């Protein structure tokens, strides 16, 4: 279902939603192309306030300012480096595991070619 079809459906089944839909602009979503970065960002943001997660993610990105945020460069950093920017040991472990899964081919580079169910089944195998 695309956005337009979803908005039409919501408008037809919920009068309050119809008012909101008519009042505000249609949402715009930016499609992510760097799936590795999206997964890492999700890990960092889990169970944190938006403000805290944003600060930690900003520090994380500064480690890769030259555009080198990829599985290999993530693995090259030490646990201590990640701890120093505010990541918990558990999140560091998850991030390393995702990076390792990318480098060993467990996670395909072209996630956009896979269905939701295939992606979910792949990701739940990683701890």
Report each predicted region and the residues it spans.
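Intrinsically disordered, low-complexity, charged terminal extensions of DNA damage-control enzymes
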Residues: 1-31
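Alpha-helical ds-nucleic-acid-binding substructure associated with the helix-hairpin-helix region
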Residues: 20, 53-127
